[in-house]
Amino acid sequence: MQTTNLAKIVAAAALVAVPLAISSISVAQAPPPRPPPIMAPSIPPAHLLDLMTAQGSAALGAQWRVSDVKIVEVPAIQGAMPQYKTTYNIEPKAGSTDFDDSKWPVIEPKDLAARRSGGHVAFMWYRSPLTIPAKIGEFDPSGAVAVLSVTVDDYAEVWVNGAIPGRSGYPSPATIQGHNMPQRVVLSTSVKAGDKFQIAVFGINGPISMAPANTVWFREAKMEFYK
């Protein structure tokens, strides 16, 4: 009798442990939280770099690489309605910090303005590392708020160190702002010499539902410093 009761207790404990284990696995597999969005200052910057010039990009050690983006058919997600057998994804997914872009062509900063893609439903990746120097000419950037400001024709999403800064329910400058609108993303509220940022800009031709006969290109790319 005691053996039977013991077996029942063990079985019940095992059943309780299963959802706990599943819950633990789910938590372990959850993606890390995105960094919160920070609104850029609205005052004039103490110093400004034009990253579409050789001099401006060189000041931050930028090396711009570019890649076309393909739309590929993939199986539908788990739990999709039965009529949906396939869906679409993009290749490559190049937002992560450790993405290998070594085979992508390097472009000159001025060629960020080149009109790329074949138009219509079209996307482009632009990637570059940025490193804060001890001095930019006579300007000392230490302690400054550093803001990356880009305007992509027509839309963009901006990845910083492997993430799109943002939080559900809050505005984020790293996400689509509007048609040909500047996106001013705070990289740090207090930079120091040697700080590194891996930037990945996902350029989008739009309006997407119109699929216009336009291309993807940078209208501007700047680094702003505020003190």
Residue ranges of each PLM-predicted region?
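Surface-exposed coil/turn segments at beta-strand junctions on protein surfaces, enriched
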Residues: 121, 141, 178-180, 191-194
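Aromatic-lined ligand-binding clefts that engage carbohydrates, nucleic acids, or primary amines
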Residues: 104, 122, 130, 135-162, ...
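Beta-strand-rich interaction surfaces with strong enrichment in secreted/lumenal proteins
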Residues: 113-119, 127-129, 173, 186-191
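Bacterial N-terminal signal peptides that target proteins for export
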Residues: 2-13
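Bacterial N-terminal signal peptides
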Residues: 11-23
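An acidic-aromatic loop/edge-strand motif
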Residues: 33-91, 104, 187-227
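Solvent-exposed beta-strand/loop surfaces of large extracellular or lumenal domains
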Residues: 160-184
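Signal peptide processing junction and immediate N-terminal pro/mature segment
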Residues: 21-32
